[in-house]
Amino acid sequence: FRELETALIKSAPLGATLRFSTPSIERLNEEFINYLNFGGYPEAVLNPAIQADVQRFLGRDIIDKVLLRDLPSLYGIQDIQELNRLFTTIAYHTGQEISLDGLAQSSGVAKNTITKYLEYLEAAFLIVRIRRVDDTGKTFQRMRNFKVYLTNPSMRAALFAPIADGDDAMGAMAETAIFSQWFHSDLMKNLHYARWKQGRTDLEVDLVRVDPARLKPTWAY
């Protein structure tokens, strides 16, 4: 990775910060897609055979070891396939706004069961839920709508198939990759996304940091 970084990312002073550029945006985008698909698994990065059949080598690992064995034994889950359906639904829609009603409809799992499973999946550090705020940075009393991110964007490729340039999921996967860099930060508990209506138009800001003392946004991406 260090060789790629040196070859593809250049930096130069710009006032008190740095300005970044690249000699080849096409190559940089290609490597970013490789990161989305395989970057979370060092064994895949270093082994073309695993990349060629990532679902077989890594997807079954996630399903068999974590979902079908570890979580059921930890939490006494009886209906393993129900948990599997919920997780695969979440993984496919990583980075998108969802609701308990929508999850129940798409996965076929009851809402009260979904609530428990979401807590289990978060405890296993497979997913992270992000709360919604309005255009002033205020949270809602009831979390009817929220976003769920995979903690590792490469899990989606392992469960389904690697994505390519132009795929519909590219935006959500890129968003998942950016959020994943914050998951170990102390700021994580203050990160949200903003969504509100302006007339008939839905507006959204993907990443908003809210000051917990003033309950006001301090920065956004």
Q: Where does each model-flagged region fall?
A:
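Conserved small helical "lid"/interfacial subdomain of P-loop NTPases
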Residues: 1-16
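Nucleotide phosphate-binding site architecture
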Residues: 2, 42, 156-157
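Residue-level signal for well-ordered alpha-helical scaffold segments within enzymatic catalytic domains
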Residues: 3-6, 34, 65, 181
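A residue-level signal for conserved active-site and pocket-lining positions in enzyme catalytic cores
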Residues: 4, 39, 86
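Short helix-coil transition/hinge motifs at the ends and kinks of transmembrane helices
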Residues: 12-24, 137, 141
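Amphipathic alpha-helical "lid/sensor" segments that cap RecA-like P-loop NTPase cores
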Residues: 17-62
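Accessory nucleic acid-recognition modules appended to NTPase machines
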Residues: 46-217
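Conserved beta3 VAIK motif of the Hanks protein kinase fold
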Residues: 221
